[in-house]
Amino acid sequence: MPSLYFGTELKLHKEVKPLILAFISGVESGKIKKNNMTPEEEKRVDRAIEILEESPIYLEREPNYDCMFLENMIEKYVNQYEVGAIMIDYVELTPPMIGEYTRMTRGLQAREDSILLNVSTVLKNLAEEFDVFIKIYTQISDNARRDHTIRDSGAIKGSKSLQVRADLGVVVMRPVERELSMLKPLIDLYGEPNICLNIYKNRDGDLGEFKVWGRINLGNYHFEELFITDWSYRPFREKIEKVYLHSDTKDEFVSELETDTVHIMEDDDLPMFDEETGEIIEEVRKPRGIRRSRS
């Protein structure tokens, strides 16, 4: 799918492009920037460059933007390049936004929450009008960095009105020691996470608030999911649908998955949980499947 990255801070060719090449190749961006790679890594990066050049990925940068700029940019890339996914990194209050809102409201006091709510509304309308996926990033407040219990819209720096129109809201943070101690039974089974995706808003989703724990390599942004919990750090106990395979294809199917990024678990591999608390009451051996990078 043709995609657009719109940035406000990072330099596109010196900072963003190496990150994309790192993700495609699996070679960490620091090595790419310093040209400190092995011959094998150089081959992978060269191939990643070819893939990127052949891919419909477009990059734009503009620190001082307003809603009209976003509307014109999105319309241009949808109509000219058939873009279907747009990433905005990141949304914050800008002087052009303040001026635009003041003119629109004929001098009404331009409060930050009102302006960002307008931005959220405009982006939601553009997503619906052009039938595109729009993902925006914003900054985390200092309070959320200090307090691990703030992992919802209260973690947004500036104003949480920015997420009002969003269908999905996620706060991405490193786990603190207190959280890791509460997760010890799961960590013993699946490994220790260094990142958590706190999904606090999931409109029309089967799950409400939940947390996805995983490991991320910040050098190439490869992410490995480890386990999922509810907002109280208890593992989910969802119904698992069984898939039955013909004996002739089962071994081949399982082998293919286990060399990808999926854990294959037999029934007796699954831990037993307390019905009331969700705590693990019987630990079992680790699953047979081993997660491996696709690269």
Show the residue positions of the predicted features.
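Cytosolic-facing regulatory segments adjacent to core modules
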Residues: P2-E82, V212
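Hydrophobic/aromatic beta-strand patches that form the interior of the parallel beta-sheet core
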Residues: L4-F6, Y58-E60, K135, V170, ...
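Structural recognition of the conserved hydrophobic beta-strand(s) that form the central parallel beta-sheet
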Residues: Y5, M87-I88, V132-Q139
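Short, ordered loop/turn segments at secondary-structure junctions
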Residues: T8, V91, Q139-I140, R174-P175
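Helical mechanochemical/support elements of P-loop NTPase systems and associated helical scaffolds
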Residues: L12, V16, M37, E41-R44, ...
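Short acidic/His/Gly/Ser-rich catalytic and metal-binding motifs that mark active-site loops
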Residues: K14-V16, T94-E100, N143-D147
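C-terminal regions of RecA-like/P-loop NTPase motor modules
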Residues: G26, K31-I32, C67-E75, N79-V83, ...
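Phosphate-binding/switch loop-helix module in NTP-utilizing enzymes
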Residues: Y58-L126
